[in-house]
Amino acid sequence: MALPKYKMSRANTRTRRSTWKAKAAQTITCPNCGAPTLAHVACPSCGSYRGRVYREAIRSAHTK
């Protein structure tokens, strides 16, 4: 197992760790219905993706 030869300073450690973080999910507005949705994923409101309907929209249990 590799071991560091020199002690890493606090500034260098924090600089290195600052790039290792989670990114926020990229959301876009659906051009069909205007609801926010994840990029490259079918819209959960209307079920369309790139102008085509791929699946039925997810409906809540109390809506009929």
Curated annotation (Swiss-Prot):
Record flagged with keyword Magnesium: no
Cellular component aspect of the GO annotation: large ribosomal subunit
GO molecular function, one term: structural constituent of ribosome
Chain segments carrying region Disordered: 1-20
Pfam families: Ribosomal_L32p
Keywords, in A-Z order: Ribonucleoprotein, Ribosomal protein
Matches recorded under InterPro entries: Ribosomal_bL32 (IPR002677), Ribosomal_bL32_bact (IPR044957), Ribosomal_zn-bd (IPR011332)
GO BP: translation
Biological source species: Bifidobacterium animalis subsp. lactis (strain AD011)
HAMAP family noted in UniProt: Ribosomal_bL32
Name used for this protein in its record: Large ribosomal subunit protein bL32
Family under the similarity heading: Belongs to the bacterial ribosomal protein bL32 family.
